[in-house]
């Protein structure tokens, strides 16, 4: 009985943490309005050229803990006039919420690495770039061009850096 109660407490605690981190419970959050908005879960079996892309990226943020079967969750939502691009990779212990306004450059950072993003909505796709400038110790000048586009009922992210392109396919989460 003691193990059951302990397991129940751990499960309930994890559920509370997950719910508290979920923007769906925040007032004023919009999950619809653009085809690419919503909660998305990657399907690693459909990924294309991810390992080659990670090699070209050569950043601390390239998530060395990830393997080819690691799932990536993306939450695209709007709060006020700001959009959020939240990335969650549990295998890599990575979580980042990138906040931006369409058509404007926004600064961001993670784990000491600085970057800027600029996204636009073009014909129902989220199109833009992420420019990495590096850390205090290591200056970088790398730009990733991203397109998030709905294909049928799946979101496809196409990313290109220095001539190397990867595709990641996402299924809509409820």
Swiss-Prot record:
Glycosylation sites: 111
Keyword terms, alphabetized: Glycoprotein, Secreted, Signal, Stress response
CDD domains with a match to the protein in the record: FABP (cd00742)
Region annotated SAHS-c3, chain positions: 118-172
Family as reported in the entry's similarity comment: Belongs to the Secretory-abundant heat soluble protein (SAHS) family.
Misc. comment: Trehalose, a disaccharide essential for several organisms to survive drying, is detected at low levels or not at all in some tardigrade species, indicating that tardigrades possess potentially novel mechanisms for surviving desiccation involving tardigrade-specific intrinsically disordered proteins (TDPs).
Protein name as annotated: Secretory-abundant heat soluble protein 2
Gene source species: Ramazzottius varieornatus
Upper taxonomic lineage: Eukaryota, Metazoa, Ecdysozoa, Tardigrada, Eutardigrada
Gene, per the UniProt record: SAHS2
């Amino acid at each position: 009985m003691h193990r059951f109660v302990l397991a129940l407490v751990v499960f309930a605690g994890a559920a509370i943490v997950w719910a508290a981190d979920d923007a769906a419970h925040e007032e004023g959050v919009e999950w619809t309005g653009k085809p690419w908005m919503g909660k998305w879960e990657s399907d690693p079996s459909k990924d294309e050229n991810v390992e080659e892309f990670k090699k070209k990226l050569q950043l601390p943020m390239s998530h060395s803990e990830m393997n080819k079967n690691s799932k990536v969750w993306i939450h695209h939502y709007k709060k006020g006039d700001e959009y959020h691009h939240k990335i969650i990779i549990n295998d890599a212990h990575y979580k980042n919420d990138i906040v931006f306004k369409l058509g404007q450059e926004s600064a961001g950072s993670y784990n000491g690495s600085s970057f800027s993003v600029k996204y636009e909505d073009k014909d129902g796709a989220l199109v833009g770039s992420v420019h990495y400038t590096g850390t205090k110790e290591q200056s970088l000048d790398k730009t990733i061009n991203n397109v998030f586009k709905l294909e049928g009922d799946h979101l496809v992210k196409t990313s290109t850096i220095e001539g190397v392109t990867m595709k990641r396919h996402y299924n809509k989460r409820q």
